[in-house]
Regions:
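Alpha-helical transmembrane segments and their membrane-interface anchoring/capping motifs
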Residues: 1-82, 125-127, 133, 137-140, ...
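Short beta-strand/loop motifs in extracellular/secreted proteins, especially
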Residues: 76, 86, 102, 163, ...
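Right-handed parallel beta-helix
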Residues: 52-66, 75-83, 99-200, 213-214, ...
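A short, sequence-level motif marking secondary-structure junctions
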Residues: 81-85, 182, 239-240, 262-264
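Short, surface-exposed interaction patches in beta-rich subdomains
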Residues: 196-207, 211-298
Length: 298
């Protein structure tokens, strides 16, 4: 082996070993806690000396029956509370010892909770993302703190049921768990909508650019899903959808349903349709996709 190649190989090996020991030392010296609380890549033109530290804020809420949420770029998550209470959490960005930036405004009036995303001043910034280190070396609480970044989380009791929900998001995802409502309007412009263990009745759902995923979710009344550019995927769907009247249509995609369903998929040119007559007393679910598949997994 040539001398310069040997020197390069030895130098690389030494740097790799040294870097590994420095990484381990940094982790045990409090590096994970630093990563969870500090944005290493933020350079705010208006205040370059201020480190921007994200703090997870949790607000206790009174019980409510109506939910009205409008967000621009934040993700919204609804999940049941281990304490069986109502709460709201979000990341608060601290710019100095005395100043902080709250990404949302919220209010409760009567039985209605209203949440709005603030129109914050935009700054030029460069971001260094080292959150993968937290996912590898962090504990469960630290991993959850990372997952809450750019996320508004609503905690609700397991048996909570809403009379009316209105959820709108321009450029973010909706992750809805254990959400039950008698009536609802859900719209996402550019993002995915994910349901799990939900119960939706008389709900109108629209998505311009993103997928809709539903797992173990029941539908009743008259519910409609319209997706312009994205797939509509149902999992664990046979038991919950088989009794319903189904109207499925896609202009540029496939329709796949379990073989146990009574209807038949019809195809003509690029258009596919499926219709199923449900049992008396059960609701109707209509799904229309302009450019995407509709797949019902048993």
């Amino acid at each position: 082996m040539k001398n310069w190649k040997k020197i390069t190989l030895i130098t690389g090996a030494v740097c790799t070993i040294l870097g590994f020991f420095l990484l381990i030392f940094g982790l045990f010296a409090g590096g994970i806690q630093y990563l969870t609380s500090t944005d290493l890549g933020s350079f705010n033109n208006s205040d370059k000396s201020a480190a921007k530290v994200q703090k997870l804020v949790t607000e206790e809420l009174s019980p409510y029956k109506n939910l009205d949420v409008s967000l621009d770029s934040l993700n919204l998550q609804v999940r049941y509370s281990k304490a069986n209470t109502y709460a709201l959490s979000y990341k608060n960005t601290k710019t100095s010892k005395t100043k902080s930036t709250t990404p949302i405004t919220w209010s409760q009036s009567g039985n209605t909770l209203k949440i709005r995303e603030r129109n914050l001043k935009k700054h030029t910034w460069f971001h260094i993302d080292l959150n993968f280190l937290i996912c590898i070396f962090g504990n469960d609480d630290e991993k959850e703190a990372v997952s809450d970044e750019d996320m508004v989380t609503l905690y609700i009791p397991k048996n909570a049921a809403f009379d009316q929900i209105t959820l709108e998001n321009n450029d973010g995802n909706l992750l809805l768990n254990n959400l039950r409502t008698s009536q609802g309007i859900i719209h996402v412009d550019d993002g995915d909508i994910i349901f799990k263990n939900c119960a939706l009745r008389n709900t109108l759902l629209t998505s311009n650019d993103g997928d809709v995923l539903s797992t173990a979710t029941t539908y009743s009344g008259n519910t409609a899903i319209t997706c312009k550019d994205g797939d509509v995927l149902f999992y664990r769907a046979a038991d919950v959808l088989k009794p319903l009247s189904l109207k499925l249509e896609t202009n540029d995609g496939e329709i796949i349903v379990p073989s146990s369903f009574s209807g038949k998929v019809k195809e003509k040119d690029d258009k596919s349709t499926y219709q199923q007559n449900g049992r008396d007393g059960y609701g109707t679910l209509s799904i229309q996709s302009e450019d995407g598949d509709i797949v019902l997994h048993a």
